[in-house]
C-alpha cells in the first residue's frame, strides 16, 4: 500500500516511528514535512503561519499538492495545525484515498482546533475522555489509539545490568522538557535527599535554583537514551496534568527499553500492564518518594518487574501493533 505522512521527520518523533513501522510492514511511504516545501527554520515558520493567514494557506496548499502528486491509498496527518483547506483539497482530488489524523498529545494541545474543523475520514487519539467527546458531541469517526514503542529503537541495552547501573551511577532519572509542574515535582524529590539526574531542556522562563545542579545538560535520544534509562535504578515518569485517562509515550518507551519506572496512577494503565499497577504507580508525590526509597533497596525486584513489562510491551504495544489496528479499522488490511 502507498501511504503518505504529513508531519515531522525528526528522529524519535511519532511520525518517524510511524514511517519506520509502515516500511517494516512492507508499505511504500511518502513522508512530507513543512521543511520540504519552504526552507525556513521550523520555529519561524510556525509563528508565521499563526500571524499571516495567507502564508498559512500557502504552505499547506503546497503540501496538499505534493501529496496529490503521489496519489497514495492512505494519508496520515499528525500535526494539529494543518490547515483544514489542505485536507479538503486532498480529499477533493483523491476521492478514493482515506485521510486520517493521529493525535498523540495531551488534550491541551489542539492549537486553534484545526483538527475539529477538518473533515478527516477518521480520527485516532489516545485519551478515552477526548474520544468520547469527539464521538458523542461532534459525531466524528473517532477511535482510541494508545501510544507505542518502536522495537528497533526502544530496546534494552545488551549489557550486564548491575555493571551498567554502577557505571551510570544514577538513582533516579527524569527526562524531557522541565515544565514548571515537572520541575516542582523534581524539587520535592531532590529535597527528600534522593540523588536525581535531570536530562532534557530546563525551563528558562521560571527556573528553580534548587534543581539546577541536578541537570546533566544533555538531551537523550536513541541508543544513549536507552543506555541512561536502562542503567538508572529508577526512571520517574510524571505525566502531564492533561493526561486525563491516558499515558504519555515515555511510559511505553521506558518499558520497551526495559528500564524500571515509577509513574502517575491512571486507571487505563491496568489495560496496558502485565504487572499490578499498584507496584509502580503513585497518587501523591509523598507516595512517589516513599516508593523510590523502597525500590532503591530492591534491585532484584526492580529488574524482575521491568523485564516482565519489557517482554509484554514488545509483544503488545509496538507501533506495528498500532498500525495494523488502524488499517483494520479502516478496512485496509
Name each model-derived stretch.
Residues 64, 68, 72, 88-89, ...:
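Catalytic alpha-helical scaffold of carbohydrate-active enzymes acting on polysaccharides/glycoconjugates
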Residues 278-285, 294-300:
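Conserved acidic donor-binding segment of nucleotide-sugar-dependent glycosyltransferases
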Amino acid at each position: 500500500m502507498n501511504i503518505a505522512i504529513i508531519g515531522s521527520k525528526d528522529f524519535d518523533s511519532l511520525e518517524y516511528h510511524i514511517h519506520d513501522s509502515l516500511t517494516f510492514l512492507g508499505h511504500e511511504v511518502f513522508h512530507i514535512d513543512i521543511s520540504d516545501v519552504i526552507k525556513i527554520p521550523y520555529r519561524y515558520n510556525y509563528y508565521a503561519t499563526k500571524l499571516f493567514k495567507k502564508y498559512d494557506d500557502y504552505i499547506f496548499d503546497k503540501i496538499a499538492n505534493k501529496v496529490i502528486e503521489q496519489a497514495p491509498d492512505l494519508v496520515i496527518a499528525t500535526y494539529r495545525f494543518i490547515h483544514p483547506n489542505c485536507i479538503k483539497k486532498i480529499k477533493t482530488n483523491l476521492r478514493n484515498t482515506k485521510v486520517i489524523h493521529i493525535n498523540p498529545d495531551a488534550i491541551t494541545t489542539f492549537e486553534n482546533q484545526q483538527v475539529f474543523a477538518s473533515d478527516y475520514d477518521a480520527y485516532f487519539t489516545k485519551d478515552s475522555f477526548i474520544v468520547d467527546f469527539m464521538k458523542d458531541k461532534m459525531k466524528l469517526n473517532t477511535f482510541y489509539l494508545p501510544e507505542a514503542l518502536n522495537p528497533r529503537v526502544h530496546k534494552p541495552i545488551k549489557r550486564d545490568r548491575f555493571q551498567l547501573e554502577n557505571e551510570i551511577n544514577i538513582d533516579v532519572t527524569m527526562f524531557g522538557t522541565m515544565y514548571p509542574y515537572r520541575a516542582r515535582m523534581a524539587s520535592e524529590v531532590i529535597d527528600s535527599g534522593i540523588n536525581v539526574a535531570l536530562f532534557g531542556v530546563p525551563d528558562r522562563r521560571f527556573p528553580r535554583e534548587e534543581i539546577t545542579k541536578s541537570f546533566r545538560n544533555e538531551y537523550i535520544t536513541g541508543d544513549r537514551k536507552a543506555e541512561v534509562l536502562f542503567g538508572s535504578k529508577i526512571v520517574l515518569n510524571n505525566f502531564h496534568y492533561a493526561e486525563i485517562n491516558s499515558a504519555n509515550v515515555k511510559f511505553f518507551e521506558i518499558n520497551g527499553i526495559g528500564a524500571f519506572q515509577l509513574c502517575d496512577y491512571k486507571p487505563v494503565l491496568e489495560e496496558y500492564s502485565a504487572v499490578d499497577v499498584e507496584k509502580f504507580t503513585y497518587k501523591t508525590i509523598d507516595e512517589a518518594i516513599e516508593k523510590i526509597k523502597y525500590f532503591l533497596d530492591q534491585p532484584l525486584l526492580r529488574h524482575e518487574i521491568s523485564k516482565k513489562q519489557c517482554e509484554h510491551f514488545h509483544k503488545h504495544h509496538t507501533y506495528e501493533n498500532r498500525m495494523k489496528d488502524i488499517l483494520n479499522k479502516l478496512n485496509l488490511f
